[in-house]
């Protein structure tokens, strides 16, 4: 699939770091920055401006410990905790590992604990207050493949016919941890997890502070509020299929040392199994920043 991996558009503003646009859909490479250094207010604002322009930004050649990644993340807001658990029963730590390594053997596997990552989603939409930013720091990557795909929900919304935009306006979908587990074929949610994360509803069309609108979709959705269950799920499946079509997708090819940030408010993403999963480790350290209630 020849996804968007080149750019023709230019960078729209001046930044205090080197920026190279990676595609016209989303994505920019930032170089010449050491994220272990203190982050000034000016630098933080510039990073947030870059996220608004590019939606996904990759700081190359970083070498952060988990503590350093946590410290960097805190510049952007409150770090989220997690509802997911390791096979041991313990909850994921604040800086947790996204990997294809088996928890018991430490060897690469085709069925990692985090296999829900291979479905289109936006992080923590099963919360009243979902994720704003997610950060992944690439520790080990396959020699080829193991990419992450990002679909631009602003572009997908703008491409809809006007009549469909009007029909979707005001519609809400119910998101839950229980739906996530069912839709991804994972172990069903425990009663404790259901109590901790009861279903929430969010608009299918999200309106942002700058006035732009985007679709708000993904695998965490169980059904459409006030609509026949099967008809609503069919509508959502069709909408997500069109929204993640090739013209709206940027593929990020990981390099060891990447610290990649993305805006969950305007993107859905998924990992790709486009590598020999039983032969090559894929290890990334993850943090996420709490966002705002979608409107």
Q: Language-model features: where?
A:
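Fe(II)/2-oxoglutarate oxygenase catalytic core
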Residues: 2-261, 265-295
């Amino acid at each position: 699939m020849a996804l968007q991996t080149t750019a023709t558009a230019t960078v729209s503003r001046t930044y205090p770091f080197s920026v190279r646009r990676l595609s016209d859909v989303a994505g920019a490479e930032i170089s010449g920055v050491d994220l272990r250094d203190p982050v000034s207010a000016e630098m933080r604002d510039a990073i947030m401006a870059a996220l608004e322009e590019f939606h996904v930004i990759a700081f190359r050649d970083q070498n952060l410990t988990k503590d350093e990644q946590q410290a960097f993340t805190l510049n952007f807001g409150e770090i989220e905790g997690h509802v997911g658990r390791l096979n041991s029963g313990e909850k994921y730590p604040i800086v947790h590992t996204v990997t294809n390594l088996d928890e018991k053997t430490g060897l690469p596997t085709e069925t990692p604990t985090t296999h829900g990552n291979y479905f289109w989603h936006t992080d923590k939409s099963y919360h009243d207050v979902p994720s704003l930013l997610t950060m992944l720091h690439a520790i080990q990557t396959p020699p080829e493949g193991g990419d992450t795909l990002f679909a631009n929900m602003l572009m997908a919304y703008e491409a809809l016919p006007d009549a469909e935009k009007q029909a979707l306006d005001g519609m809400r979908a119910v998101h839950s941890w229980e739906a996530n587990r069912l839709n991804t074929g994972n172990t069903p949610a425990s009663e404790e997890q259901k109590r901790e994360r009861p279903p929430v509803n969010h608009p299918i069309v999200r309106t942002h502070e700058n006035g732009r609108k985007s679709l708000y979709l993904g695998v965490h959705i169980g059904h459409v509020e006030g609509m026949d269950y099967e008809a609503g799920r069919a509508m959502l499946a069709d909408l997500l299929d069109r929204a993640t079509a090739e013209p709206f997708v940027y593929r990020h090819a990981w390099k060891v040392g990447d610290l990649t940030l993305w805006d969950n408010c305007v993107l859905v993403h998924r990992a790709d199994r486009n590598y020999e999963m039983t032969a090559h480790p894929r290890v990334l350290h993850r943090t996420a920043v709490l966002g705002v209630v979608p409107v």
